[in-house]
């Protein structure tokens, strides 16, 4: 069962936080691998949930007011968080994705950049924040190239 989460950028730490969406989660902290994150008040949450960003390659639900479904976002400048440490990333991706063969971490970084970050590279925003998507979703990609079926799920 997929939880509904909204993504919020924490500029102080340069990471993208996942926050629960829904009446049952308001006011409760979200406890995850990176620690406990308090849910923001409704007035502090942007209503577009990042729709102003040009993120070609993310599925349609990433910009939904309900938040993305069945997606796991982690972000860091060089993929060096406890969630996506280099030694665990290929194994995690192999278990959670379809259509990808087992690849090295370097190959995965190149794959993500080619599929997800073209617009950010052109606008100079890639260094500020890099988003790595670990997981899948049944929604279609936004302006995605035809060969990329990373978000396809069974």
UniProtKB/Swiss-Prot annotation:
Transmembrane segments: none
Annotated S-S bridges: none
This protein's record includes keyword Repeat: no
Post-translational modification remark: A fraction may be phosphorylated in insect cells and HepG2 cells, a human hepatoblastoma cell line. Phosphorylated in vitro by host protein kinase C or mitogen-activated protein kinase. N-acetylated in insect cells.
Region (Mitochondrial targeting sequence): 68-117
Keyword Transcription regulation recorded: yes
One matching Pfam family: X
Stored InterPro entries: Transactivation_prot_X
Main location: host cell
Subcellular location: Host cytoplasm; Host nucleus; Host mitochondrion
GO cellular component, one term: host cell mitochondrion
Gene Ontology biological process: DNA-templated transcription; symbiont-mediated activation of host NF-kappaB cascade; symbiont-mediated arrest of host cell cycle during G2/M transition; viral genome replication
Swiss-Prot/TrEMBL keywords: Activation of host NF-kappa-B by virus, Activator, Apoptosis, Host cytoplasm, Host G2/M cell cycle arrest by virus, Host mitochondrion, Host nucleus, Host-virus interaction, Modulation of host cell cycle by virus, Transcription, Transcription regulation
Family: Belongs to the orthohepadnavirus protein X family.
Function: Multifunctional protein that plays a role in silencing host antiviral defenses and promoting viral transcription. Does not seem to be essential for HBV infection. May be directly involved in development of cirrhosis and liver cancer (hepatocellular carcinoma). Most of cytosolic activities involve modulation of cytosolic calcium. The effect on apoptosis is controversial depending on the cell types in which the studies have been conducted. May induce apoptosis by localizing in mitochondria and causing loss of mitochondrial membrane potential.
Assembly information from the UniProt record: May form homodimer. May interact with host CEBPA, CFLAR, CREB1, DDB1, E4F1, HBXIP, HSPD1/HSP60, NFKBIA, POLR2E and SMAD4. Interacts with host SMC5-SMC6 complex and induces its degradation. Interacts with host TRPC4AP; leading to prevent ubiquitination of TRPC4AP. Interacts with host PLSCR1; this interaction promotes ubiquitination and degradation of HBx and impairs HBx-mediated cell proliferation.
Protein name (database record): Protein X
Organism: Hepatitis B virus genotype D (isolate France/alpha1/1989)
Annotated gene: X
